[in-house]
Amino acid sequence: MPLVSVIVPAWNVAEFIPAAIASVLAQSFTDFELVIVNDGSPDTKALEAAIAPFRNRTDTHYLVQENRGPSGARNAGILHARGRYVAFLDADDEWEPTYLEQQLARFSDDESLDLVYCNSRLTGDSVLAGRTYMDTTPSTGPVTLEALITLTCNVPTTCAVARRQAVVSAGLFDPQIRRCEDFDLWLRMSAQGSRFAYHRAVLAIRRLHPDSAAADGVRMFESQLVVYRKLQSLLGASHQAAPLVGHQIRRAEADLSLERSKQLLMAGQYPEAAEALAAARRFYKSRKLALASIGLRAAPGLVRRMYAGRAVR
């Protein structure tokens, strides 16, 4: 049996997946299997042509299913996997050659760990290209449930290797969640007692797209709210982390209102933008938002020009 199962979900990624697969096959650590999951991709013909050079390898498995989203695709890979560990790689990302070797070394150093993640270099069509993930989304201190809830520690899926049994015991990825589905799983794993650790070695390359899920603020915060409310129900009111979850729900509601306000402002729907901004101000008490609120009522066109493409918080 392989020690590691590398799971690569594929949906509309024929252009990028050869580089992702090549980065797996170039690993210095070789005791792995590769599981590619075609998640009902509309570019299946091109996808299968792209992966054809790799299909005849005994360590490579290709699964095809109807579209179930990233959670359903990763779950199919996990359930097919034979490795003690699962490593997740998005099909448009890549790993450095020592990725698996260095990640697994952390498990050898501390056998109580259930998940290890590292840093990555950002690339693609984004203002963040050239920076590292931990430059923009830091992890600070121990990876506790509280640190995950408050986003003090942030786990990127492409940079994570986990014990397969810990993932299965937590209930796998939730197929009903198509954004922040990884965040949801990490929270559930931590809540059940799984131990996480990170290191800052830059071992992955993450490709950013302007039309990616993370680029849509409204949908991202909507998904965050779904995840936090799910965790609130899971933990119950008596859990020591319950107040933190409640605070994060209020914060995410305010962030969602703020994103909606910006969208409505740019669409010229000024009264609705002012109403959404007022909702955000019930959490955020900044002077800048207070001035923006006054401006939206007195001179909305001017505010629109001033805040086009800028964060108002």
Language-model-detected regions and their locations in the chain:
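C-terminal subregions of glycosyltransferases and related glycan-biosynthesis enzymes
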Residues: F196, L208-R313
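Nucleotide-sugar donor-binding/catalytic module of glycosyltransferases
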Residues: M1-E222
